[in-house]
Curated annotation (Swiss-Prot):
Its cofactor is Zn(2+). This is Leucine aminopeptidase 1. One of its GO terms (cellular component) is extracellular region. Glycans are attached at residues 119, 149, 164, 181, 233. Zn(2+) 1 binds at residues 189, 208, 274. It comes from Paracoccidioides lutzii (strain ATCC MYA-826 / Pb01). Residues 20-88 form a propeptide. Belongs to the peptidase M28 family. M28E subfamily. Its EC number is 3.4.11.-. GO terms for biological process: proteolysis. InterPro entries: M28_fam, Peptidase_M28. Its main location: secreted.
Amino acid sequence: MKLPALLTLGVAASTKVLAAIVSDQTPLNDAKKDELPEKFLIEVAPGDTRWVTEDEKWELKREGLKFFDITTEAEKGFLPKAFPTPAVVNFPSELNRRAEVKQLAMKLSKENMFNHLTNFTAFHTRYYKSMIGIQSATWLLEQVQKTINDSLAVNYGAKVETFNHSWGQFSIIASIPGRTNKTVVVGSHQDSINMYLPTILAAPGADDDGSGTVTILEALRVLLKSDAVAQGNATNTIEFHWYSAEEGGLLGSLAVFSRYQQENRDIKSMLQQDMTGYSQGTLDAGELESVGVITDYVHSGLTEFIKKIVTAYCDIPFVLTKCGYACSDHASARRFGYPSAFVMESKFEHSSQLIHTVWDTVEYLDFDHMLEHAKMTLGLVYELAFAEL
């Protein structure tokens, strides 16, 4: 971030307003000044771990290094020492629900996504250790609950629950029962962070990952317009996840999938939607608008099936790209042996450079592009909901 921007922010904010913001944004479990900084165990590559302070975490992220924060799961003894071999899942060789998906996709709304994202980014930050982060999660919980309440699914066992964490901001899980306990998961992360001064500066997080958050919320709304899904007649159970604390090292999703492993949950697939709204980088590079299908640290079978989904249900093509180790919450599912995949807004190198700053705002996003991600999400979930996995 450039120094003039910081100075402008400081001059523009009144002392009273800034004091109120800092108060709500201060970490809920802030260490006393005379105590040594708390250290966290991070994993930056398979088998490559190190102890770092919170400030060192942010420095590593500013340098572009991605990691798991495995402190809690390692202490509890729940973390596998190596990546487990994913369970064998036979994803469909062809798409079988084209007519239903295309009919439903016509009901997806850019306006809904815009309105939700405008409200979501109005929070000064969604920093996972702050009171404002709890407030933003509470607002999101209300939107998810309203989405379910407005559908038939509320009468057939669909529900939304919080998954609580020690740092304050909770994760959110919406469940739509199917005829079996085999489960199809779609996720995004709800937290945001300003990587320069997390406890002071604004972190609107429009693209990272407000865009994914509202994309899957809109896909959920339209999915529940299917009577078969809403009434619990799909073959498989469906879950939509909004994780807390992705920015801190995939903390929320690690906790969720750690518990799922302990409970022997039968998770057949997990798709992550993180950063779905920025297309200008691709266009500026002279390339065609597309979605970026991640090819590293993902399940190859699920990824191949997603390519078919994009080709069938989206109006733009896919490109193949890589994002590195522990680059988003799909990695947590993979870390515990569940088949996972990740689709983002573009090739990784063309993705938004405004993330983690005060400039990650709605005005830079393309809601037509987000609509393509919503189509892909809807198509994937609907096809897998009725598949024999």
